[in-house]
């Protein structure tokens, strides 16, 4: 079993990482309170970046609470595909309680996985097992 940690290697750290995702969006998963943008990476694991503006979450306490929730739900998703993911906050996020935020994020992570599976071609179709 993998350790469910959140090391630096699972975060988008540089502005160039964010720019690459914004310029090459392959998956977009909308929600009333969040928007997830994702782009494939070659690392073999997912990385996440967070963008929560003062316009949508006025108080730093609110921004930090939501960011903690996003990081925690991301950390508990070890089976996410190799994607660079940006989570953007939308208006109305400050009115949600922690349980609602957590359930919304878990739903979004499942939608990301589902959309990724649908967008990538199945390798087993071209080469059925046992036939060579």
Swiss-Prot record:
Pfam families: Ribonuclease_P. Its EC number is 3.1.26.5. HAMAP family: RNase_P (MF_00227). Belongs to the RnpA family. The keyword Hydrolase applies. GO terms for biological process: tRNA 5'-leader removal. PANTHER family: RIBONUCLEASE P PROTEIN COMPONENT. InterPro entries: Ribosomal_Su5_D2-typ_SF, Ribsml_uS5_D2-typ_fold_subgr, RNase_P, RNase_P_CS. GO terms for molecular function: 3'-tRNA processing endoribonuclease activity; ribonuclease P activity; tRNA binding. It is an enzyme of class 3 (hydrolase). RNaseP catalyzes the removal of the 5'-leader sequence from pre-tRNA to produce the mature 5'-terminus. It can also cleave other RNA substrates such as 4.5S RNA. The protein component plays an auxiliary but essential role in vivo by binding to the 5'-leader sequence and broadening the substrate specificity of the ribozyme. This is Ribonuclease P protein component. Consists of a catalytic RNA component (M1 or rnpB) and a protein subunit. Keywords: Endonuclease, Hydrolase, Nuclease, RNA-binding, tRNA processing. It catalyses: Endonucleolytic cleavage of RNA, removing 5'-extranucleotides from tRNA precursor. It comes from the Bacteria. One of its GO terms (cellular component) is ribonuclease P complex. The keyword Nuclease applies.
